[in-house]
Amino acid sequence: MKNFKLAEPQSIEQALALLSASGDKVCLMSGGTDLLTEVKEGVAEPDIIIDLRTIPGLSYITKEKDAIRIGALTALADLARDPLIVEEYPGLHQAALAVATPQIRNVGTVGGNLCQRPRCWYYRDAQVNCRKKGGSQCFAYKGRNKYHALFGGGMCYMVYPSDLAPALISFDAQAVISTPRGDKTLPLADFYALPAKNIRRENILGPDELLHEVRIPLSKKEDKSAYIKLKERGAWDFALVSAAVKGTGSGAGWTDLRIILGG
């Protein structure tokens, strides 16, 4: 493992300033359950890690007049047991419970789950120089690809491992991104980037930007939702395939029915 410096900003502004001044050898850390694995295995070799946990006020679930606001550093365990989420957004509640183990959910965060790196074993092997790491080919195309994409491959056949993303997208969630130029809000569905757009990244965050909040429109009384995740093992695992479903109505009167596939 390469040595690195740990930065502990006290505000979002300080974190953005560190990002702007640190070039491309810097990583953001929230819970650290994914990033520290990459660092230990030599897949990520940052000079600086910015620990967002030292910034106060980024863990919250609040109901406003037009949306539910969820802070990026909200623990997955807190999201899963929040009464508002359990009662009004069962699909999101189920997705949060589907992540990993209770121990990991106590540490992992909403922002970390939405911004994690892919689980492709070629990408995760520091000795394999795949396209996502600057190489010339996707080894999954003709190699071991049991867990890779059936559709939309080409440059890279990785799939995205987040359980929260399909559920939140089914609720038409918005991502709030902090930048040195001010905050910007966009649909969470537009937060992600296919390999054809940027082979080295899975989202559209710029080098001086960070995700600090997710917003979900207020639920309606007639809303129904669910999340299902199929795994190879009975114990915790990443999805072979997953689906989030959200609709309004009942019986034959369904409107705005959405099915978001993952895994």
Question: Locations of the language-model features?
Answer:
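C-terminal structural segment of proteins
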Residues: 1-263
